[in-house]
Amino acid sequence: MRPRAPACAAAALGLCSLLLLLAPGHACPAGCACTDPHTVDCRDRGLPSVPDPFPLDVRKLLVAGNRIQRIPEDFFIFYGDLVYLDFRNNSLRSLEEGTFSGSAKLVFLDLSYNNLTQLGAGAFRSAGRLVKLSLANNNLVGVHEDAFETLESLQVLELNDNNLRSLSVAALAALPALRSLRLDGNPWLCDCDFAHLFSWIQENASKLPKGLDEIQCSLPMESRRISLRELSEASFSECRFSLSLTDLCIIIFSGVAVSIAAIISSFFLATVVQCLQRCAPNKDAEDEDEDKDD
Protein backbone atom coordinates (compact mmCIF):
# COMPACT_ATOMS: atom_id res chain seq x y z
CA MET A 1 0.00 0.00 0.00
CA ARG A 2 2.97 2.34 0.53
CA PRO A 3 3.56 3.04 -3.21
CA ARG A 4 0.27 4.90 -3.23
CA ALA A 5 1.56 7.54 -0.82
CA PRO A 6 3.34 9.64 -3.48
CA ALA A 7 0.24 9.52 -5.67
CA CYS A 8 -1.98 10.66 -2.81
CA ALA A 9 0.45 13.40 -1.94
CA ALA A 10 0.51 14.59 -5.56
CA ALA A 11 -3.29 14.58 -5.70
CA ALA A 12 -3.49 16.55 -2.47
CA LEU A 13 -0.96 19.04 -3.76
CA GLY A 14 -2.90 19.45 -7.00
CA LEU A 15 -6.14 20.00 -5.08
CA CYS A 16 -4.50 22.60 -2.88
CA SER A 17 -3.12 24.36 -5.94
CA LEU A 18 -6.57 24.41 -7.52
CA LEU A 19 -8.12 25.83 -4.36
CA LEU A 20 -5.46 28.52 -4.22
CA LEU A 21 -6.11 29.33 -7.88
CA LEU A 22 -9.82 29.76 -7.30
CA ALA A 23 -9.54 31.50 -3.96
CA PRO A 24 -10.36 35.22 -3.74
CA GLY A 25 -7.26 37.38 -3.83
CA HIS A 26 -5.31 35.06 -6.11
CA ALA A 27 -2.18 36.63 -7.63
CA CYS A 28 -2.55 38.87 -10.69
CA PRO A 29 -2.06 37.51 -14.22
CA ALA A 30 1.44 37.75 -15.61
CA GLY A 31 2.25 41.22 -16.91
CA CYS A 32 -0.58 42.91 -14.99
CA ALA A 33 -0.50 44.86 -11.75
CA CYS A 34 -2.78 44.69 -8.74
CA THR A 35 -2.88 48.18 -7.28
CA ASP A 36 -5.25 47.06 -4.52
CA PRO A 37 -6.98 43.79 -3.56
CA HIS A 38 -9.89 44.40 -5.95
CA THR A 39 -8.19 46.16 -8.89
CA VAL A 40 -6.31 44.59 -11.81
CA ASP A 41 -4.43 46.87 -14.22
CA CYS A 42 -3.47 45.33 -17.59
CA ARG A 43 -3.40 48.52 -19.65
CA ASP A 44 -1.11 49.00 -22.66
CA ARG A 45 0.44 45.53 -22.57
CA GLY A 46 -0.23 44.55 -26.20
CA LEU A 47 -2.37 41.63 -25.05
CA PRO A 48 -4.13 39.67 -27.85
CA SER A 49 -6.78 38.26 -25.50
CA VAL A 50 -8.22 38.81 -22.05
CA PRO A 51 -5.61 37.49 -19.58
CA ASP A 52 -6.68 34.79 -17.17
CA PRO A 53 -7.15 34.07 -14.38
CA PHE A 54 -8.00 37.13 -12.32
CA PRO A 55 -8.81 37.18 -8.62
CA LEU A 56 -12.43 36.02 -8.45
CA ASP A 57 -13.33 39.04 -6.32
CA VAL A 58 -11.91 41.59 -8.79
CA ARG A 59 -14.15 44.64 -9.00
CA LYS A 60 -12.18 47.00 -11.23
CA LEU A 61 -10.51 45.72 -14.40
CA LEU A 62 -8.43 47.94 -16.68
CA VAL A 63 -7.50 46.38 -20.05
CA ALA A 64 -7.41 49.49 -22.25
CA GLY A 65 -4.78 49.85 -24.96
CA ASN A 66 -4.42 46.21 -26.00
CA ARG A 67 -5.29 44.11 -29.08
CA ILE A 68 -8.16 42.10 -27.61
CA GLN A 69 -10.77 41.07 -30.22
CA ARG A 70 -13.46 39.47 -28.06
CA ILE A 71 -14.84 39.21 -24.56
CA PRO A 72 -15.20 35.53 -23.57
CA GLU A 73 -18.84 34.45 -23.30
CA ASP A 74 -18.38 33.08 -19.77
CA PHE A 75 -16.24 35.96 -18.54
CA PHE A 76 -18.80 37.53 -16.19
CA ILE A 77 -19.94 34.14 -14.93
CA PHE A 78 -16.54 33.76 -13.25
CA TYR A 79 -16.08 37.45 -12.38
CA GLY A 80 -19.56 38.43 -11.28
CA ASP A 81 -18.29 40.97 -8.72
CA LEU A 82 -16.92 43.22 -11.47
CA VAL A 83 -18.21 46.78 -11.14
CA TYR A 84 -15.87 48.75 -13.41
CA LEU A 85 -14.57 47.56 -16.82
CA ASP A 86 -12.33 49.76 -18.97
CA PHE A 87 -12.09 48.08 -22.40
CA ARG A 88 -11.07 51.15 -24.42
CA ASN A 89 -8.78 51.12 -27.41
CA ASN A 90 -8.86 47.43 -28.28
CA SER A 91 -9.87 45.49 -31.41
CA LEU A 92 -13.33 44.36 -30.30
CA ARG A 93 -15.47 43.70 -33.39
CA SER A 94 -18.72 42.33 -31.97
CA LEU A 95 -20.58 41.55 -28.78
CA GLU A 96 -21.69 37.94 -28.81
CA GLU A 97 -25.10 37.05 -27.44
CA GLY A 98 -24.79 36.34 -23.74
CA THR A 99 -21.47 38.16 -23.36
CA PHE A 100 -22.74 40.08 -20.33
CA SER A 101 -24.54 37.18 -18.65
CA GLY A 102 -23.64 37.38 -14.98
CA SER A 103 -22.73 41.08 -15.06
CA ALA A 104 -25.45 42.09 -12.61
CA LYS A 105 -23.07 44.28 -10.58
CA LEU A 106 -21.44 46.10 -13.50
CA VAL A 107 -21.89 49.88 -13.21
CA PHE A 108 -19.26 51.36 -15.56
CA LEU A 109 -18.47 49.98 -19.03
CA ASP A 110 -16.18 51.71 -21.52
CA LEU A 111 -16.02 50.10 -24.98
CA SER A 112 -14.89 53.22 -26.82
CA TYR A 113 -12.21 53.16 -29.54
CA ASN A 114 -12.96 49.63 -30.71
CA ASN A 115 -14.23 48.23 -34.03
CA LEU A 116 -17.87 47.52 -33.19
CA THR A 117 -20.23 47.86 -36.17
CA GLN A 118 -23.57 46.56 -34.88
CA LEU A 119 -25.46 46.35 -31.59
CA GLY A 120 -27.98 43.53 -31.58
CA ALA A 121 -31.14 43.13 -29.53
CA GLY A 122 -30.46 42.75 -25.83
CA ALA A 123 -26.72 43.28 -26.25
CA PHE A 124 -26.48 44.34 -22.58
CA ARG A 125 -29.51 42.44 -21.31
CA SER A 126 -27.97 41.19 -18.05
CA ALA A 127 -26.18 44.44 -17.18
CA GLY A 128 -29.21 46.04 -15.59
CA ARG A 129 -27.22 48.17 -13.12
CA LEU A 130 -25.11 49.98 -15.71
CA VAL A 131 -24.92 53.70 -15.00
CA LYS A 132 -22.43 54.71 -17.71
CA LEU A 133 -21.91 53.08 -21.12
CA SER A 134 -19.44 54.47 -23.64
CA LEU A 135 -19.54 53.24 -27.24
CA ALA A 136 -17.84 56.30 -28.68
CA ASN A 137 -15.34 56.16 -31.54
CA ASN A 138 -16.36 52.79 -32.92
CA ASN A 139 -17.66 52.00 -36.42
CA LEU A 140 -21.30 51.57 -35.47
CA VAL A 141 -23.68 51.68 -38.42
CA GLY A 142 -26.67 50.05 -36.76
CA VAL A 143 -28.23 49.90 -33.29
CA HIS A 144 -31.18 47.56 -32.75
CA GLU A 145 -34.20 49.17 -31.14
CA ASP A 146 -33.91 46.66 -28.26
CA ALA A 147 -30.15 47.01 -27.83
CA PHE A 148 -30.51 48.85 -24.51
CA GLU A 149 -33.48 46.98 -23.05
CA THR A 150 -33.31 46.39 -19.28
CA LEU A 151 -30.81 49.27 -18.81
CA GLU A 152 -33.21 51.11 -16.53
CA SER A 153 -30.39 52.59 -14.43
CA LEU A 154 -28.30 53.94 -17.31
CA GLN A 155 -27.64 57.66 -16.91
CA VAL A 156 -24.81 58.30 -19.39
CA LEU A 157 -24.71 56.93 -22.95
CA GLU A 158 -22.01 57.89 -25.44
CA LEU A 159 -22.66 57.10 -29.12
CA ASN A 160 -20.59 59.92 -30.55
CA ASP A 161 -18.07 59.57 -33.39
CA ASN A 162 -19.52 56.50 -35.07
CA ASN A 163 -21.07 55.94 -38.51
CA LEU A 164 -24.71 56.19 -37.51
CA ARG A 165 -27.10 57.66 -40.08
CA SER A 166 -30.27 56.84 -38.17
CA LEU A 167 -31.34 55.61 -34.74
CA SER A 168 -34.65 54.23 -33.52
CA VAL A 169 -36.34 56.36 -30.87
CA ALA A 170 -37.45 53.10 -29.23
CA ALA A 171 -33.81 52.40 -28.33
CA LEU A 172 -33.66 55.65 -26.34
CA ALA A 173 -37.15 55.35 -24.90
CA ALA A 174 -35.96 52.22 -23.08
CA LEU A 175 -33.68 54.38 -20.90
CA PRO A 176 -35.86 56.10 -18.26
CA ALA A 177 -32.89 57.28 -16.14
CA LEU A 178 -30.91 58.78 -19.04
CA ARG A 179 -29.36 62.17 -18.21
CA SER A 180 -26.54 62.56 -20.72
CA LEU A 181 -26.43 61.45 -24.37
CA ARG A 182 -23.65 62.03 -26.92
CA LEU A 183 -24.76 61.81 -30.57
CA ASP A 184 -22.31 64.23 -32.19
CA GLY A 185 -19.75 63.10 -34.74
CA ASN A 186 -22.10 60.84 -36.70
CA PRO A 187 -23.09 61.23 -40.38
CA TRP A 188 -26.81 61.62 -39.64
CA LEU A 189 -29.14 61.79 -42.63
CA CYS A 190 -32.00 64.25 -42.18
CA ASP A 191 -34.64 62.33 -44.12
CA CYS A 192 -38.11 61.27 -43.05
CA ASP A 193 -36.70 58.37 -41.01
CA PHE A 194 -34.77 60.94 -38.97
CA ALA A 195 -37.89 63.01 -38.25
CA HIS A 196 -38.89 60.99 -35.15
CA LEU A 197 -35.38 61.15 -33.72
CA PHE A 198 -35.26 64.89 -34.35
CA SER A 199 -38.49 65.36 -32.38
CA TRP A 200 -37.05 63.30 -29.51
CA ILE A 201 -33.81 65.31 -29.57
CA GLN A 202 -35.72 68.59 -29.38
CA GLU A 203 -37.77 67.36 -26.44
CA ASN A 204 -34.66 66.09 -24.65
CA ALA A 205 -32.14 68.79 -25.63
CA SER A 206 -31.14 69.23 -21.98
CA LYS A 207 -29.62 65.74 -22.06
CA LEU A 208 -27.16 66.68 -24.82
CA PRO A 209 -23.97 67.96 -23.13
CA LYS A 210 -22.79 69.65 -26.35
CA GLY A 211 -26.22 70.87 -27.42
CA LEU A 212 -27.81 70.82 -30.87
CA ASP A 213 -25.00 72.79 -32.47
CA GLU A 214 -22.55 69.89 -32.40
CA ILE A 215 -24.94 67.43 -34.09
CA GLN A 216 -24.97 67.77 -37.86
CA CYS A 217 -26.82 65.98 -40.62
CA SER A 218 -26.93 65.81 -44.40
CA LEU A 219 -30.03 66.90 -46.24
CA PRO A 220 -31.42 64.48 -48.86
CA MET A 221 -30.16 65.21 -52.38
CA GLU A 222 -27.64 67.71 -50.99
CA SER A 223 -24.00 67.31 -50.05
CA ARG A 224 -23.86 70.02 -47.40
CA ARG A 225 -24.20 69.31 -43.71
CA ILE A 226 -26.10 71.55 -41.34
CA SER A 227 -26.46 71.80 -37.59
CA LEU A 228 -29.67 70.55 -36.02
CA ARG A 229 -29.97 74.03 -34.57
CA GLU A 230 -30.89 75.23 -38.06
CA LEU A 231 -33.77 72.76 -38.38
CA SER A 232 -37.29 72.76 -36.97
CA GLU A 233 -40.35 70.55 -37.09
CA ALA A 234 -41.36 72.44 -40.24
CA SER A 235 -38.25 71.07 -41.95
CA PHE A 236 -39.91 67.66 -41.91
CA SER A 237 -43.43 68.82 -42.84
CA GLU A 238 -43.38 66.87 -46.09
CA CYS A 239 -42.80 63.68 -44.14
CA ARG A 240 -46.26 63.91 -42.63
CA PHE A 241 -47.73 63.12 -46.01
CA SER A 242 -45.18 60.54 -47.06
CA LEU A 243 -46.07 56.87 -46.89
CA SER A 244 -43.88 54.06 -45.71
CA LEU A 245 -43.45 50.86 -47.68
CA THR A 246 -45.85 49.13 -45.29
CA ASP A 247 -48.48 51.81 -45.86
CA LEU A 248 -48.11 51.49 -49.62
CA CYS A 249 -48.46 47.71 -49.43
CA ILE A 250 -51.62 48.04 -47.36
CA ILE A 251 -53.11 50.54 -49.80
CA ILE A 252 -52.24 48.38 -52.82
CA PHE A 253 -53.62 45.24 -51.17
CA SER A 254 -56.81 47.04 -50.19
CA GLY A 255 -57.23 48.34 -53.74
CA VAL A 256 -56.75 44.88 -55.22
CA ALA A 257 -59.18 43.36 -52.73
CA VAL A 258 -61.83 45.98 -53.51
CA SER A 259 -61.34 45.45 -57.25
CA ILE A 260 -61.73 41.69 -56.93
CA ALA A 261 -64.84 42.13 -54.80
CA ALA A 262 -66.30 44.54 -57.38
CA ILE A 263 -65.62 42.09 -60.23
CA ILE A 264 -67.24 39.21 -58.33
CA SER A 265 -70.24 41.36 -57.44
CA SER A 266 -70.62 42.50 -61.05
CA PHE A 267 -70.42 38.92 -62.32
CA PHE A 268 -72.99 37.76 -59.79
CA LEU A 269 -75.33 40.64 -60.63
CA ALA A 270 -74.98 40.01 -64.37
CA THR A 271 -75.79 36.34 -63.83
CA VAL A 272 -78.91 37.19 -61.86
CA VAL A 273 -80.07 39.67 -64.51
CA GLN A 274 -79.49 37.13 -67.28
CA CYS A 275 -81.49 34.51 -65.41
CA LEU A 276 -84.33 36.95 -64.92
CA GLN A 277 -84.29 37.83 -68.59
CA ARG A 278 -84.52 34.17 -69.56
CA CYS A 279 -87.37 33.55 -67.19
CA ALA A 280 -89.39 36.57 -68.38
CA PRO A 281 -90.17 35.26 -71.97
CA ASN A 282 -91.30 31.92 -70.58
CA LYS A 283 -93.64 33.71 -68.24
CA ASP A 284 -95.07 35.81 -71.09
CA ALA A 285 -95.60 32.68 -73.22
CA GLU A 286 -97.46 30.98 -70.41
CA ASP A 287 -99.71 34.02 -70.00
CA GLU A 288 -100.52 34.00 -73.76
CA ASP A 289 -101.40 30.30 -73.67
CA GLU A 290 -103.74 30.90 -70.77
CA ASP A 291 -105.47 33.73 -72.69
CA LYS A 292 -106.02 31.47 -75.75
CA ASP A 293 -107.51 28.73 -73.61
CA ASP A 294 -109.98 31.21 -72.20
UniProtKB/Swiss-Prot annotation:
Positions of the LRRCT domain: 186-241
Cysteines joined through disulfide linkages: C28-C34, C32-C42, C190-C217, C192-C239
Keyword Signal listed: yes
Extent of the LRR repeats: 57-78, 81-102, 105-126, 129-150, 153-174
Keywords carried by this UniProt record: Cell membrane, Disulfide bond, Ion channel, Ion transport, Leucine-rich repeat, Membrane, Repeat, Signal, Transmembrane, Transmembrane helix, Transport
Residue span(s) of domain LRRNT: 28-56
Signal peptide feature range: 1-27
Parts of the chain that traverse the membrane: 250-270
Tissue-wise expression: Mainly expressed in adrenal gland, thymus and skeletal muscle.
Membrane topology type: Single-pass type I membrane protein
Example of a GO cellular component annotation carried by this entry: plasma membrane
Subcellular location: Cell membrane
Any matching Pfam family: LRR_8
GO term, biological process aspect, one: positive regulation of voltage-gated potassium channel activity
Main location: membrane
Top-rank taxon: Eukaryota
Molecular function, one GO term: potassium channel activator activity
Domain writeup: The transmembrane domain is necessary for interaction with KCNMA1.
Subunit-level organization: Interacts with KCNMA1.
Role description: Auxiliary protein of the large-conductance, voltage and calcium-activated potassium channel (BK alpha). Modulates gating properties by producing a marked shift in the BK channel's voltage dependence of activation in the hyperpolarizing direction, and in the absence of calcium.
Protein name per UniProt: Leucine-rich repeat-containing protein 38
Lineage: Eukaryota, Metazoa, Chordata, Craniata, Vertebrata
